[in-house]
């Protein structure tokens, strides 16, 4: 059996919206706007947002100028997904396999917990070759079927969602901040003290038992 997927990695141009933002700008990408393709991309983003709200982590890997691409999230009101929905991103001209390797390391996830969604067949094949355990679905030519394709995967474990799952994007971002702050400390112990981490010990109860089971399963995986 395949492992439940925890991370959905997404391309941007012709995946989250129609058109190439570097050529048309954030105002003219095809998203919403009472156009059948724009509505299809919006539906797809809605489905992704639902997964995110159930604890699935989102990331972006896109060959674009970062500043230009991020304008869509900041300025285009038709966008369903916002920047704070994503745990991390790599928007550059680097090899996508290299970018995915960095993201998996950054989020401390194994490749078999990842789904890679990209409209470009060459990019999909590149990831398949480099990461055999990453799930890389074949995308239909018509974006209006993207939502259906994502639903068909049925690989995301969203049946039993804990409070920790819902806050995972925040946890990842907090962890990245801590790693950056670590560079300012010579002593590892001083860095740990600066974090002011508190540990609460609880008995197993109805509120935390689902999380306890998750941790047991993670320990067994190790």
Residue ranges and their predicted role:
Residues 134-141:
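Short hydrophobic/aromatic-enriched beta-strand-loop microsegments
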Residues 5-21, 127:
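Asp-based phosphoryl-transfer active-site loop
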Residues 28-36, 76-95, 102:
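Glycine-rich phosphate-binding "P-loop"
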Residues 215-222:
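Helix-loop element at the rim of GNAT/NAT acetyltransferase active sites that forms part
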């Amino acid at each position: 059996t395949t492992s439940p997927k925890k991370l959905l990695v997404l391309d941007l141009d012709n995946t989250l919206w129609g058109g190439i933002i570097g050529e048309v700008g954030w105002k003219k990408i095809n998203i919403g706007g009472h156009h059948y393709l724009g509505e299809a991309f919006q539906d797809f983003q809605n489905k992704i947002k639902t997964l995110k709200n159930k604890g699935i982590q989102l990331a972006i890997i896109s060959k674009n100028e970062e500043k230009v691409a991020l304008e869509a999230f900041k300025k285009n009101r038709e966008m369903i997904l916002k920047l704070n929905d994503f745990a991390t991103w790599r928007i550059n001209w680097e090899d996508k396999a290299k970018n995915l390797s960095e993201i998996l390391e950054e989020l401390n996830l194994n490749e078999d917990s990842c789904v890679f969604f990209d409209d470009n067949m060459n990019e999909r094949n590149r990831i398949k070759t480099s990461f055999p355990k990453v799930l890389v679905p074949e995308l239909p030519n018509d974006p209006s079927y993207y939502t259906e394709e994502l639903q068909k995967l049925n690989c995301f474990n969203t049946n039993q969602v804990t409070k920790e799952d819902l806050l995972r994007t925040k946890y990842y971002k907090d962890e990245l901040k801590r790693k950056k702050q670590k560079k300012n400390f010579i002593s590892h112990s001083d860095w740990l003290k600066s974090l002011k981490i508190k540990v609460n010990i609880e008995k197993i109860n109805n509120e935390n038992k689902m999380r306890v089971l998750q941790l047991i399963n993670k320990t067994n995986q190790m």
